[in-house]
Amino acid sequence: MRVVITGATGNVGTSVVERLASDDTVTEVVGVARRGTDWSPPKTCWITADVAVDDLEPVFRDADAVIHLAGAFQPTHRPLATWRNNVLGSMRVFDAVASAGVPVLVHASSVGAYSPRADGERVDESWPTNALPTAAYGRVKSYVERVLDTFERDHAGVRVVRLRPGFIFKRSSTEAQRRLFVGPLLPNGTAAAGPDPGGAGPSRPASAGAAPVGRRRCVPPGSHPRRARRVQRRR
């Protein structure tokens, strides 16, 4: 089984890559990220690409599943930037999944997509996903849910799985989460519980490289390449 993961060097993406790389039923993991990485888990190829710009169909071709984790929580004060990354990027991923004939699409939405409930009671997955009108991130995720509704209607042969998690934290990404949520409000070192995801290793993206295979570069186990090749940009 060949699985492609967008946002593969992110907080969640690195854990997914690590898990799939250890799964005997998975023959190849293709990690897609805007920046490369020195991390080289088994059976993993890295492709440097921006989902909002680059041509994704060649990357998704022959994949058994695409797991779409790429997105941006910040900058909330620049809604056009988050719209580009979360909405336009997701739309291009969905289109490429359809064009490449991928049978399974897993999309990471957010608990923020759910509509508020006045009485504060718990809800299940059938609850409307119209978001809180004043929450910028939730509005974006809600819009993508509507796009995905249309995708499911038009591509009945594709199995679509939607994830709506809350915040996901792990020890190795402490420093990156500190920068994301509190920035300069928390002094450096106060939350230093693990390595920065900006380096190498699980949850630590950096720069990459490897043996070339077509338009991508694969990372053989134990190698330490310098830079992954970018995919061709659509003109």
Residue ranges and their predicted role:
Residues A81-R92, R139-V140, A210:
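Glycine-rich NAD(P)-binding loop of the Rossmann-fold in SDR/ketoreductase-type enzymes
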Residues M1-T25:
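N-terminal Rossmann NAD(P)H-binding glycine-rich loop of SDR-like oxidoreductase domains
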Residues D38, T44, T48-L88, A96:
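NAD(P)H-binding glycine-rich loop region in Rossmannoid oxidoreductase-like domains
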Residues G214-R235:
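Mid/C-terminal beta-alpha module of Rossmann-like enzyme folds, strongest
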